[in-house]
Amino acid sequence: MVKKVSRRLRDAQAKVENKAYEPLEALTLLKELATAKFDETAEAHIRLGIDPKYTDQQLRTTVSLPKGTGRTVRVAVITRGEKVQEANNAGADIVGSEELIEEIAKGMMDFEVLIATPDMMPKVAKLGRQLGPRGLMPSPKGGTVTTDLTGAIAEFKAGKLEFRADRTGIVHVQFGKASFSAEDLLVNLKALQETVDRNRPSGAKGRYWRTVYVSSSMGPSIQVDISALRDLKLAEG
């Protein structure tokens, strides 16, 4: 079946030239083409020269977006003992021990981030079927297996995101809202680019960066000039 493209999207696509845009120009265009009746999310799609079926070519890490995500992040914490009170005091939305594990096993997924203390991981591990496909399984690399619950909860609430390359080597990250200024979106996109460069897998060979596209959630894809993004120096502050 041929997918029907809405007139709104077709009109927006007509405004995007077949070229790689300067980063700020691309983000200005993203904002202009975000015409849905809600505050659309800004998304980046980065194709890397990696083959994640090899362990030394996998990318899974976190980025702290300086300008935040623009959305309220619901954080769940699996812990026990006095750490339950610490998690509650730090502003976690859902906190529990074995009973929370059972709820998740039954399909409760009312959160965007799941943090666990190391002592609970043997029990959390059995939730692989529920958490794995959604990328929600806690991991030390993702900053979601930790004893510092106060710090971790604060960071994820403030705009820290975990991301990974999918099996085709593409990274998909939501890096703000269309209501952000183009300059703030650029600060977040630059932080993402630097994080991807800093965490280049040891087995990555040849050209690492292949393509970068940005879009709003209902808008067309806009190609970004990779060299211009990587060479960009932003003023501090």
UniProtKB/Swiss-Prot annotation:
UniProt-recorded name of the protein: Large ribosomal subunit protein uL1
Cysteine pairs bridged by disulfides in the record: none
Organism name: Microcystis aeruginosa (strain NIES-843 / IAM M-2473)
Keyword flag Chloroplast: no
Record gene name: rplA
Source superkingdom: Bacteria
Entry's family note: Belongs to the universal ribosomal protein uL1 family.
Cited Gene3D superfamilies: 3.30.190.20, 3.40.50.790
Function: Binds directly to 23S rRNA. The L1 stalk is quite mobile in the ribosome, and is involved in E site tRNA release.
Database matches in HAMAP family: Ribosomal_uL1_B
